[in-house]
C-alpha cells in the first residue's frame, strides 16, 4: 500500500520536536509525499505554542518545498467531557485537528469507562477529525465503543507509527486489535508518522505492517490519495456551516 500524505507531524513549535516546517516539507518531498499535516501540540502541552500561534497559521503558504501543507493541531483531550485545549474560535480556522490523550493533561488510569468517555466526547466535537494514538496502553479503552462513535460521526482512527518505534511502549497489541476491529466495522483509518524530527516524516513502515496484518484495504485508509482528504475537508466544512449548501 502506497501512502502519499502524512497526517501527523510536529515542528519546533511543539516544544520537544526538532525541525522546522520547511525541513519537514523538504523531507516529505524527498520521500515522495504530496501533502503533510502540520499538527503541533496544543498549548497545554509543556513547551508548546500559545494559542495565537495556531490562529496565525493562515500566513503559511499552501505549498512548501513542493509539498502541500494542511495547517492543524494535535489538541489535548483535557477531561472526561472531551474538552480540548484550544477554543472553537481557533479550531474553526484550522484545516485538520487530531485529538489525543497525553499524560501531562489527562491522568493515566485503568478506568476504561472514563478513558472511553473522554475519547467519544472528543469525537463528537465537530472540529475534531482524527483520534490520535488510541492504542496507548496507559489509557485502556472500549475499542468497539470508540470505533462505533468514530463511524457514526465520520471520524478517523489513527494508526501511529511512532507507537511502534519510540513512544508509548506496549502499544502493538492494542493497535492491532483496533485495526482488526476497524476492518470488521468499516471504520476509516489515518496513518501518522507522529514525526518529532524531519527524518521521521513519512515513516510508516511499522504502521503499515499492522494495517496489512489486520486486513485493512486501501478504501479505508485516508493516506492513499490526496483527493480523499480534500473531499473529507470539503464535506466537514459544509457540515459545520462553513460554506453554502
From Swiss-Prot:
Keywords: Hydrolase, Metal-binding, Zinc. Zn(2+) 1 binds at residues 8, 10, 74, 194. GO terms for cellular component: cytosol. It comes from Thermoanaerobacter pseudethanolicus (strain ATCC 33223 / 39E) (Clostridium thermohydrosulfuricum). This is Probable phosphatase Teth39_0577. Belongs to the PHP family. The keyword Secreted does not apply. Zn(2+) 2 binds at residues 16, 41, 196.
Amino acid at each position: 500500500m502506497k501512502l502519499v500524505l502524512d497526517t501527523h507531524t510536529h515542528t519546533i513549535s511543539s516544544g520537544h520536536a526538532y525541525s522546522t516546517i520547511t525541513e519537514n516539507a523538504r523531507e516529505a518531498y524527498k520521500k515522495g509525499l504530496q501533502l503533510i499535516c502540520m499538527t503541533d501540540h496544543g498549548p497545554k502541552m509543556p513547551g508548546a505554542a500559545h494559542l495565537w500561534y495556531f490562529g496565525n497559521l493562515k500566513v503559511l503558504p499552501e505549498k512548501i518545498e513542493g509539498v502541500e501543507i494542511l495547517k492543524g493541531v494535535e489538541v489535548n483531550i483535557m477531561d472526561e467531557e472531551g474538552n480540548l485545549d484550544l477554543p472553537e474560535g481557533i479550531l474553526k480556522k484550522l484545516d485538520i485537528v487530531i485529538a489525543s490523550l497525553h499524560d501531562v493533561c489527562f491522568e493515566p488510569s485503568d478506568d476504561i469507562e472514563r478513558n472511553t468517555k473522554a475519547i467519544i466526547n472528543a469525537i463528537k466535537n465537530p472540529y475534531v477529525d482524527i483520534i490520535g494514538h488510541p492504542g496507548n496502553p496507559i489509557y485502556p479503552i472500549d475499542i468497539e465503543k470508540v470505533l462505533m462513535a468514530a463511524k457514526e460521526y465520520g471520524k478517523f482512527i489513527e494508526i501511529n507509527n511512532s507507537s511502534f518505534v519510540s513512544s508509548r511502549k506496549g502499544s502493538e497489541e492494542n493497535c492491532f486489535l483496533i485495526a482488526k476491529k476497524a476492518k470488521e466495522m468499516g471504520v476509516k483509518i489515518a496513518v501518522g508518522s507522529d514525526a518529532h524530527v524531519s527524518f521521521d516524516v513519512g515513516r510508516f513502515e511499522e504502521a503499515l505492517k499492522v494495517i496489512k496484518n489486520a486486513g485493512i484495504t486501501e478504501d479505508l485508509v485516508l493516506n492513499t490519495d490526496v483527493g480523499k482528504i480534500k473531499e473529507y475537508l470539503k464535506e466537514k466544512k459544509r457540515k459545520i456551516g462553513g460554506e453554502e449548501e
